[in-house]
Amino acid sequence: MDFYHFAKSVVYGVLKPLYRLDVKGTEHFPKEGGVLVCSNHIADLDPPVVGITAPRPINFMAKAELFEAPILKNLLPNLHVFPVKRGLSDRNAIRTAISLLKDGQVVGMFPEGTRRKDGTLGKGMSGAGFFALKGGDTVVVPCAIIGPYRPLRKVKVRYGRPLDITPFRERKAGAEEVTEAIMQEIRLLIEKEKSAK
């Protein structure tokens, strides 16, 4: 077992019972090929929760400052985390994400770009659409996290059916249009869960 899967099993063993994680829709994940997982963002725990519930190893961007700490500099790459310089158009991070997708790997992102602690869904940033369009044959798997995170209170994680980006590519749609389509899929997952209460 490599370090990534070891860490995943340890974190899963802690977070699953603590937040009574209720996960559905993992069968929608393609077993191979590039996948961009796009989720709403309600708390700092979202990246590890998506990481431990996704059925395939998932790569995330994290602010470059985290890599300045010696321990994290060595640890984060083993957790499939790569640096991004926030507030800049970081070409290295962009190239890394696109390369991972074209290589048939999974990249996770939170299109809102910031946490929405009230649980409402914000506007998605065009980066999600950009990566979806530029990532070769990448498909998008929408994800909804329904909280809040409170110990021993159920947190729901829902993965939706893959969104095929081919029609958008064929008609040369822009990144913003693709992002809006992605956000709509996330919104539908959230609304479906809330209406089921």
Which sequence ranges carry the predicted segments?
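Non-catalytic C-terminal accessory region of glycerolipid acyltransferases
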Residues: 2-3, 92-197
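Catalytic core of membrane glycerolipid acyltransferases/transacylases, capturing the structured
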Residues: 3-9, 13-17, 29-88
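Aromatic-capped interface at the extracytoplasmic side
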Residues: 17-24
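A residue-level signal for beta-strand positions that form part of recognition/binding surfaces
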Residues: 20, 34, 57, 137, ...
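Secondary-structure boundary/capping positions in well-ordered alpha/beta enzyme cores
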Residues: 21, 56-57, 82, 104, ...
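Glycine-rich, highly charged phosphate/nucleotide-binding loops
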Residues: 22, 89-93
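Residues at the C-termini of beta-strands that transition into short coil/loop
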Residues: 27, 64, 85, 144, ...
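Short amphipathic alpha-helix with an adjacent loop that forms part of the alpha/beta core around
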Residues: 27-29, 98-99
